Amino acid sequence: MASTAARRLAWVAVRPGALWSGPRGRRGGDVYTVPGSSGLSQVPSRSVIVTRSGAILPKPVKMSFGLLRVFSIVIPFLYVGTLISKNFAALLEEHDIFVPEDDDDDD
């Protein structure tokens, strides 16, 4: 009887996470996968908001996007987009794939 108890204690000490009473299964990101009755069910975890002890983490540093940053990205991409569309329209017209007709304005 004592040897059986000693073996069980040794097995518990060797097995990782054996004394942890949380959901059993693999942890993937912010969701624990737990074997359930119909396959795997997911239990949400708040590891991004709180620490393991339950303390709330401080707010992350907020990066401010000024108008200069927004315009420095938007304006060049708008310009490149208009150049691409203008060149593609000229290519279509050159190969007579799409030629706009000016005769339709007399309705």
UniProtKB/Swiss-Prot annotation:
Keywords for the protein's UniProt record, in alphabetical order: Calcium, Calcium transport, Ion transport, Membrane, Mitochondrion, Mitochondrion inner membrane, Transit peptide, Transmembrane, Transmembrane helix, Transport
Post-translational note: Undergoes proteolytic degradation in neurons: degraded by AFG3L2 and SPG7 before SMDT1/EMRE assembly with the uniporter complex, limiting the availability of SMDT1/EMRE for MCU assembly and promoting efficient assembly of gatekeeper subunits with MCU.
Annotated localization: Mitochondrion inner membrane
Topology of the protein relative to the lipid bilayer: Single-pass membrane protein
Stored Pfam families: DDDD (PF10161)
GO CC annotation: mitochondrial inner membrane; mitochondrion; nucleoplasm; uniplex complex
GO biological process, one term: mitochondrial calcium ion transmembrane transport
Keyword field contains rRNA-binding: no
UniProt topological domain (Mitochondrial intermembrane) ranges: 86-107
Residue ranges annotated as Mitochondrial matrix topological domain: 48-65
Gene Ontology molecular function, alphabetical: channel activator activity; protein-macromolecule adaptor activity
Keyword Isomerase applies: no
Motif GXXXX[G/A/S], chain ranges: 81-85
The organelle targeting sequence, given as a residue range: 1-47
Tissue: Widely expressed.
Impact after mutating residue 60 to A: Abolishes calcium uptake into mitochondria. Abolishes interaction with MCU
Transmembrane segments: 66-85
Family: Belongs to the SMDT1/EMRE family.
Subunit structure: Component of the uniplex complex, composed of MCU, EMRE/SMDT1, MICU1 and MICU2 (or MICU3) in a 4:4:1:1 stoichiometry. The number of EMRE/SMDT1 molecules is hovewer variable, ranging from 1 to 4 copies per uniplex complex, leading to uniplex complexes with distinct gatekeeping profiles. Interacts (via its C-terminal poly-Asp tail) with MCUR1; the interaction is direct. Unprocessed form interacts (via transit peptide) with MAIP1.
Entry note about domains: The GXXXX[G/A/S] motif at the C-terminal part of the transmembrane region mediates interaction with MCU and is required to activate the calcium-conducting pore in the uniporter complex.
Free-text function comment from the UniProt entry: Essential regulatory subunit of the mitochondrial calcium uniporter complex (uniplex), a complex that mediates calcium uptake into mitochondria. Required to bridge the calcium-sensing proteins MICU1 with the calcium-conducting subunit MCU. Acts by mediating activation of MCU and retention of MICU1 to the MCU pore, in order to ensure tight regulation of the uniplex complex and appropriate responses to intracellular calcium signaling.
Stated name of the protein: Essential MCU regulator, mitochondrial
Organism, as annotated: Mus musculus (Mouse)
Gene name linked to the record: Smdt1
